[in-house]
């Protein structure tokens, strides 16, 4: 059974906690489907080309129908002309969203957590809180404190998951390129797969692994 690594206040390993047994044997295809769903939902539908009705010009016949030796033409907005309309071009009314079932979302999240635990990249700490130093009635050195926490983990990049994230913790991690801090309500399988390691507050971990099959 896969286990998450429990860290103490100095981010040193002090134990482990098991993931629920239902996490075993989940098909990895659920994660693939969720990633496709996530990326397609985020896709901006902005690609647009003008058809022959939308390009400017073309109000008159460019040359006489007969006698010139050239192929007949009725308007310079025809797709055969340079600067004419585009045939079968991109339109901005396409829906790229891919449907995914609620159960598949849950299974994708569970598989991603299981995968991180098997790779020993899932960590649990009591609390993720960056307070900084109060100077002149302002909190300073927030990013410095967050970076020290990240460096202590010795990971390539890290996703931090809080139970109830405060604004100072969010601000502290915003300036770090290889870190992202989120509330547990924002946790999804794509983010778990995108980062090489995950650090979760104990309360956030318990919330994430609770059985949601009846919801």
From Swiss-Prot:
Residue intervals passing through the bilayer: none
InterPro entries: Ribosomal_uL4 (IPR002136), Ribosomal_uL4-like (IPR013005), Ribosomal_uL4_dom_sf (IPR023574)
Keywords, comma-separated and alphabetical: Ribonucleoprotein, Ribosomal protein, RNA-binding, rRNA-binding
GO molecular function, one term: rRNA binding
One Gene Ontology cellular component: ribosome
Pfam families to which the protein is assigned, alphabetical: Ribosomal_L4
Function: One of the primary rRNA binding proteins, this protein initially binds near the 5'-end of the 23S rRNA. It is important during the early stages of 50S assembly. It makes multiple contacts with different domains of the 23S rRNA in the assembled 50S subunit and ribosome. Forms part of the polypeptide exit tunnel.
Protein name: Large ribosomal subunit protein uL4
Organism: Helicobacter pylori (strain P12)
Organism ancestry: Bacteria, Pseudomonadati, Campylobacterota, Epsilonproteobacteria, Campylobacterales
């Amino acid at each position: 059974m896969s286990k998450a690594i429990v860290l103490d206040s100095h981010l040193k390993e002090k134990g482990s906690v098991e993931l629920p047994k239902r996490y075993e044997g989940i098909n990895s295809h659920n994660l693939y489907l969720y990633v496709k769903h996530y990326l397609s939902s985020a896709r901006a539908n902005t690609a647009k080309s003008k058809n022959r009705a939308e390009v400017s010009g073309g109000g008159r016949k460019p040359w006489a129908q007969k006698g010139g030796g050239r192929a007949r033409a009725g308007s310079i907005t025809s797709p055969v002309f340079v600067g004419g309309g585009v045939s079968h071009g991109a339109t901005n009314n396409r829906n790229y969203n891919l449907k995914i079932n609620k159960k598949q979302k849950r299974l994708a999240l569970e598989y991603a957590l299981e995968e991180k635990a098997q790779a020993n990249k899932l960590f649990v700490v009591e609390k993720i809180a960056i307070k900084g130093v109060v100077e002149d009635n302002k909190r300073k050195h927030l990013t410095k404190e967050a970076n020290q926490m990240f460096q202590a983990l010795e990971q390539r990049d890290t996703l931090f998951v809080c139970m109830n994230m405060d604004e100072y913790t969010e601000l502290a991690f915003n300036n770090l390129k290889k870190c992202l801090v989120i509330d547990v309500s924002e946790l999804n399988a794509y983010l778990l797969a995108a980062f090489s390691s995950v650090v979760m507050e104990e309360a956030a971990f318990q919330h994430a692994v609770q059985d949601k099959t009846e919801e």
